[in-house]
């Protein structure tokens, strides 16, 4: 006998139907059903409801969804389901009977079924309205399920979709009303829209003014970069830019034609022109007659162009002595400010030197020194300012000479008896070191490495041969054969960059790489006024182009014989490039000898930071 025996009451049946209602509720919500144990009276044993889960699509498993805990066979039905089916049949037979007795458990079960089903439908409606989108202002539906018994159970469920459709229509109507009311609200503050428009116009005007200010600043920076680019400190002229080229040509004093045989990769560099030997045509416009070119500057510029004055120290000292002569000869009007008038005069004379040959970094630092001292003479008299500037320039020249003396002392201490010293090209400081070592009667051998087209090492050879030193003269391509015998390498410097890289005569990097390969110390001798804050990683961004005609000459040919490239300009596809400098990376440099001592190349930024006022004298 099943658990639904004689002792089962209507409470047992009501509890089981309530669980069935919960099951239907979870079924409609899409929640999986699990096996539940329903508790009855103490006299009856608990009954387990098997889980009923529909099999997935396409599956033929007949046992899918059956409870593994069910003790009944597949053909047997659950006693709870059989009891409920019997009660449903009794309800259908007694639909017309309105009498209800408390003893009749079937009628009470029917009422419980109707009430449970109404609760299920109301809960489903609440779940549907809870899934409404955010922002809907419709009120929650208040469905009052009828507690009166109906004739059949399906008659209670069809009422829900009608109520849902009515509530949805009400929601749509309310949303339409809200949408109609929304555009009417912003029409009230019309003045605010006008104020916003005026504010936007003001903002646009301010942005346009800011853009114009930026453009003006950039144009001023471009103008100032030409002057700053002269000293080699910050900006570099890009001659391949047509705008900058047009501005530079307007500012030029010497009118020289542009070179048509330039190499495309180096169009951004100033091209060499060999028209200075035929004379110089200086423009004499009316606004420029007030600031004439000094004769000493003209002669100095021509010497620069013909390379009669070469070397960073020689060029800087010659320029500073020419400035002293300008200060002595210039007389400003008494009602004019001396510093302003002299500044305009210096700019024009410096531009002439730039047109003759691009000035070196050491010359640029010297010009900055003079301009700094000139700015301190605003409150001085004309004579007092003149004397102060001449005295400052003489001190600067003495500083260069004292720096050379200090470098010579430090360099001689690194030369020992029996050393084999190698030097490349010609450096004034290295020459002084060798002469001092000879005076100290140190026994060493010197190797001079030279290269085309300048052959600067040959001039050094002629000057040192008279001192009785054993000298070996080789060309650059033979460095790898002679480097095995070398103990130290001494070279000069065109400039030392803030990242420790060296700019020197073209071919220096090859010598440094060979010295690194054979573990030979590579020592650089450089004054601190040649240091620059520029950072450069190659020799293409900044360089100078020499006379391409120098590459045509061949020393191996006999006198009177024609050169093989005598008419090279007639070949339109042939272009000659004569770069004057190259860059040696910091990894190949072992030591930099300065007037402050012997430093590693990594300490160059420290010198620029700590001794900037002493080296360059710029606030």
UniProtKB/Swiss-Prot annotation:
Region (Disordered): 21-251
MF terms (GO), sorted A to Z: guanyl-nucleotide exchange factor activity; translation initiation factor activity
Keywords of the record: Cytoplasm, Initiation factor, Protein biosynthesis
Keyword Cell membrane (UniProt): no
Record's subcellular location: Cytoplasm, Cytosol
GO BP term, example: cytoplasmic translational initiation
Domain of life assignment: Eukaryota
Biased composition (Basic and acidic residues): 21-32, 200-244
SUPFAM superfamilies: NagB/RpiA/CoA transferase-like (SSF100950)
Broad class of the protein's primary localization: cytoplasm
Pfam family, one: IF-2B
UniProt feature, compositional bias: Low complexity: 42-56, 85-98, 136-199
Biased composition, class Polar residues, residue ranges: 57-84, 99-125
Cross-referenced InterPro entries: IF-2B-related, IF_2B-like_C, NagB/RpiA_transferase-like
GO CC annotations, alphabetized: cytosol; eukaryotic translation initiation factor 2B complex
Cited function: Acts as a component of the translation initiation factor 2B (eIF2B) complex, which catalyzes the exchange of GDP for GTP on eukaryotic initiation factor 2 (eIF2) gamma subunit. Its guanine nucleotide exchange factor activity is repressed when bound to eIF2 complex phosphorylated on the alpha subunit, thereby limiting the amount of methionyl-initiator methionine tRNA available to the ribosome and consequently global translation is repressed.
Family classification: Belongs to the eIF-2B alpha/beta/delta subunits family.
Summary of subunit composition and partner proteins: Component of the translation initiation factor 2B (eIF2B) complex which is a heterodecamer of two sets of five different subunits: alpha, beta, gamma, delta and epsilon. Subunits alpha, beta and delta comprise a regulatory subcomplex and subunits epsilon and gamma comprise a catalytic subcomplex. Within the complex, the hexameric regulatory complex resides at the center, with the two heterodimeric catalytic subcomplexes bound on opposite sides.
The protein, known as: Translation initiation factor eIF2B subunit delta
Organism: Dictyostelium discoideum
Gene assigned in the entry: eif2b4
């Amino acid at each position: 006998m099943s658990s639904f025996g004689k002792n089962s009451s209507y409470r047992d049946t009501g509890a089981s139907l309530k669980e069935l209602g919960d099951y239907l509720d979870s079924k409609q919500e899409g929640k999986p059903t699990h096996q539940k144990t329903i508790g009855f009276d103490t006299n009856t044993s608990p009954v387990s409801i098997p889980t009923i889960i529909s099999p997935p699509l396409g599956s033929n498993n007949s046992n899918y969804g059956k409870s593994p805990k069910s003790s009944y066979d597949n053909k047997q039905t659950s006693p709870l389901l059989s009891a409920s089916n019997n009660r449903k049949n009794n309800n259908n037979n007694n639909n017309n009977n309105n009498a209800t007795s408390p003893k009749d458990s079937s009628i009470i079960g029917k009422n419980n079924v109707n009430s449970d089903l109404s609760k299920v439908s109301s809960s489903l409606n609440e779940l549907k309205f809870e899934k409404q989108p955010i922002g809907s202002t419709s009120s929650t539906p208040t469905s009052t399920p009828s507690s009166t018994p109906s004739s059949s159970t399906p008659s209670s469920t069809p009422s829900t979709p009608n109520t849902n459709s009515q509530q949805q229509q009400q929601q749509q109507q309310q949303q339409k009303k809200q949408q109609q009311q929304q555009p009417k609200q912003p029409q009230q503050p019309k003045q605010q829209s006008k104020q916003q428009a005026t504010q936007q116009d003001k903002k646009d005007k301010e942005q346009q003014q800011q853009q114009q200010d930026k453009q003006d600043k950039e144009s001023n920076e471009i103008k100032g970069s030409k002057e700053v680019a002269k000293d080699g400190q910050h900006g570099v002229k890009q001659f391949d830019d047509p705008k900058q080229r047009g501005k530079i040509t307007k500012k030029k004093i010497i009118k020289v034609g542009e070179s048509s045989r330039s190499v495309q990769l180096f169009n951004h560099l100033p091209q060499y022109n060999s028209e200075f030997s035929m004379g110089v045509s200086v423009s004499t416009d009316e606004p420029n007659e007030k600031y004439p070119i000094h004769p000493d500057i003209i002669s100095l510029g021509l010497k620069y162009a013909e390379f009669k004055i070469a070397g960073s120290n020689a060029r800087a000292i010659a320029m500073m002595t020419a400035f002293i002569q300008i200060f002595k000869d210039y007389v400003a009007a008494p009602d004019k400010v001396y510093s302003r008038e002299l500044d305009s005069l210096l700019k024009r004379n410096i531009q002439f030197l730039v047109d003759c040959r691009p000035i070196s970094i050491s010359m640029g630092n010297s010009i900055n020194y003079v301009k700094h001292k000139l700015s301190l003479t605003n409150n001085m008299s004309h004579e007092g300012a003149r004397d102060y500037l001449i005295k400052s320039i003489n001190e600067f020249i003495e500083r260069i000479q004292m720096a050379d003396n200090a470098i010579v002392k430090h360099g001689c201490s690194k030369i020992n008896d029996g050393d084999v010293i190698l030097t490349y090209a010609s450096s004034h400081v290295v020459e002084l070191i060798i002469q001092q070592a000879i005076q100290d009667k140190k026994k060493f051998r010197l190797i001079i490495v030279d290269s085309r087209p300048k052959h600067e090492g040959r001039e050094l050879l002629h000057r040192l041969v008279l001192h009785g030193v054993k000298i070996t003269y080789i060309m650059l391509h033979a460095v790898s054969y002679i480097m095995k015998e070398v103990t130290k390498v001494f070279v000069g410097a065109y400039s030392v960059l803030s990242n420790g890289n060296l700019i020197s005569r073209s071919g220096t990097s090859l010598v440094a790489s060979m010295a690194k390969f054979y573990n030979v110390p590579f020592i650089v001798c450089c004054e601190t006024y040649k240091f620059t804050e520029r950072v450069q990683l190659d020799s293409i961004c900044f360089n100078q182009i020499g006379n391409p005609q120098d590459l045509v000459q061949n020393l191996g040919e006999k006198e009177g014989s024609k050169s093989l490239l005598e008419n090279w300009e007639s070949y339109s596809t042939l272009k000659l490039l004569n770069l004057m400098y190259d860059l040696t990376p910091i990894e190949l440099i072992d030591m930099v000898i300065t007037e402050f001592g012997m430093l590693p190349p990594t300490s160059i930024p420290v010198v620029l930071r700590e001794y900037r006022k002493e080296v360059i004298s710029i606030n």
